[in-house]
Amino acid sequence: MRDPRDIIKRPVITERSMEMMAEKKYTFDVDVKSNKTEVKDAIEAIFGVNVDKVNIMNYKPKAKRVGRHAGFTSRRRKAIVKLTADSKEIEIFQGV
């Protein structure tokens, strides 16, 4: 099994993700090869919370240009994690 800190890359801090925190839903960028079960186990191992549900979204790379040089941004995978009602909050989002 992979290390949980290799699966969870970073939290996503946006207006929408901050509003979803009231419903105990937290948003993270995750590894593009990870699945829902790995994300659930990683969140429970890192933060010590109980996960109810995991939704995952894939983002395709976008075409970008700098002068005459063309390329693509890297593809992303985002996970929205819903905690159980009796679970504690995730502390990483408290200071934001």
UniProtKB/Swiss-Prot annotation:
One of its GO terms (cellular component) is ribonucleoprotein complex. The keyword DNA repair does not apply. The keyword Lipid metabolism does not apply. It holds the Pfam family Ribosomal_L23. Keywords: Ribonucleoprotein, Ribosomal protein, RNA-binding, rRNA-binding. GO terms for biological process: translation. GO terms for molecular function: rRNA binding; structural constituent of ribosome. One of the early assembly proteins it binds 23S rRNA. One of the proteins that surrounds the polypeptide exit tunnel on the outside of the ribosome. Forms the main docking site for trigger factor binding to the ribosome. Belongs to the universal ribosomal protein uL23 family. Part of the 50S ribosomal subunit. Contacts protein L29, and trigger factor when it is bound to the ribosome. PANTHER family: 60S RIBOSOMAL PROTEIN L23A. NCBIfam families: PRK05738.2-4 (NF004363). This is Large ribosomal subunit protein uL23. It comes from Bacillus mycoides (strain KBAB4) (Bacillus weihenstephanensis). The lineage of its organism: Bacteria, Bacillati, Bacillota, Bacilli, Bacillales.
